[in-house]
């Protein structure tokens, strides 16, 4: 399933360099109405994630000014990052988010570990609603004798 094809992150720059200021991250959050950024190193490799929660927990909570803090000071690095793969199902992505109580998943290709997108909990809710509405429509059509079930077209 190409879940991330309809993601709100497909149309925006969702990456930020780890040496940028926390203020730059907040500016991107606000400009694109998103809540998470993939953090990259100098070679543009994804090394972490920076979310609104990271900002609140690490900048605002410690009284730092966001012009002083760098993205690398507040982001989540390494093995703590939970990722999805392009072929992951809606259910798999939802379980990953619920297991770690997170609201965003970076989409990484398993072959070369390349970041190809990002999913938000909002994207998963929209996909779930679409699936449920399609199921309801099919069942309603079946009940009414429509939809080609058992040659009743």
Language model feature labels by segment:
Residues 48-51, 103, 116-125:
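Short hydrophobic beta-strand motif reused across regulatory alpha/beta modules
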Residues 56-69, 125-137:
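A short, polar/charged loop-to-alpha-helix boundary motif
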């Amino acid at each position: 399933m190409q879940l991330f094809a309809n993601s709100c992150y497909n149309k925006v720059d969702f990456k930020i360099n780890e040496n940028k200021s926390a203020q730059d991250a907040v500016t991107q959050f606000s400009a694109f109405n998103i809540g998470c950024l993939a953090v990259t190193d100098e070679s543009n490799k994804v090394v972490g994630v920076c979310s609104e929660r990271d900002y609140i927990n690490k900048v605002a909570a410690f009284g730092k000014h966001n012009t002083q803090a760098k993205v690398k000071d507040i982001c989540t690095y390494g093995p703590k990052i939970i990722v999805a793969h392009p072929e992951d199902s809606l259910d798999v992505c939802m379980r990953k988010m619920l297991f770690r109580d997170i609201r965003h998943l970076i989409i990484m290709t398993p072959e070369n570990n390349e970041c190809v997108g990002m999913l938000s909990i909002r994207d998963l809710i929209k996909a779930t609603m679409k699936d449920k509405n399609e199921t309801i429509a099919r069942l309603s059509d079946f009940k009414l004798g429509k939809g080609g079930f058992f040659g009743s077209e």
